[in-house]
Amino acid sequence: MRRPMVAGNWKMHGTRASVAELINGLRHLALPSGVDVAVFPPCLYINQVIDGLKGKSISVGAQNSAVESMQGALTGEIAPSQLVDAGCSLVLVGHSERRQIMGERDGMLNRKFAAAQACGLIPVLCVGETLEQREAGKTLEVVGRQLGSIIEELGVGAFANAVIAYEPVWAIGTGLTATPQQAQDVHKAIREQLAAENSEVARGVRLLYGGSVKAANAVELFGMPDIDGGLIGGASLNADEFGAICRAAGN
């Protein structure tokens, strides 16, 4: 049985004051015991969040990390080893905003994924298609290629200690949401692609859905057989809304 997971991606939001307020809200949440909960704050506030959430069952991750696992001469980057030293346990890899805006390609993301795992971080690989690609009927082709790049270079076994998040680009921050069945269809295809290589890995890996998830639609989304939780954007900036989504995953 896969343990549900809800992860909050705070993106480039927050000040020390607003982060402190959000931490306080999270500390007062009654979270379901059967759900893994994580937050991904901006790197400047990672230490503040880790310190503020001590004693609370909420893991802290980073939104990005370097292609090299150890510290060195790579200006502006943060090594996975440094994230571990700071207290992080997870890192996002390949979020659509990194792919679309920062131009990160599969080869670079393979290196980031491997570097993170080499340091003991759990990578959360983000995959998803644009609206143009969906309308052209290329959703499974695009997602399959993004997933297949990791499998080809690192082997399917790399997903034994990783999480996959399907985030249709057209549903991120737009208010649009894939229907539960649309999301399930892609999640099922992802699991089948993994199963073609290793059925045990496929059964065990957690697949999260991201794309305008809210408390109002979380129950129906999380009720799908291959959706194991969510990667939450804007709704994770409101502690009460985030808590409601976590409880939906627990149900």
Curated annotation (Swiss-Prot):
Active site: H95 (electrophile), E167 (proton acceptor)
SUPFAM superfamilies linked to this entry: Triosephosphate isomerase (TIM)
InterPro entries associated with the record: Aldolase_TIM, TIM_sf, TrioseP_Isoase_bac/euk, Triosephosphate_isomerase, Triosephosphate_isomerase_AS
Compartments reported by the entry: Cytoplasm
Record keywords: Cytoplasm, Gluconeogenesis, Glycolysis, Isomerase
Tagged with keyword Cytoplasm: yes
Pathway recorded for this protein: Carbohydrate biosynthesis; gluconeogenesis; Carbohydrate degradation; glycolysis; D-glyceraldehyde 3-phosphate from glycerone phosphate: step 1/1
GO molecular function, one term: triose-phosphate isomerase activity
Coiled-coil annotated spans: none
Domain of life of the organism encoding this protein: Bacteria
PANTHER family per the UniProt record, alphabetical: TRIOSEPHOSPHATE ISOMERASE
Complex formation: Homodimer.
Protein name: Triosephosphate isomerase
Species, as recorded: Pseudomonas fluorescens (strain Pf0-1)
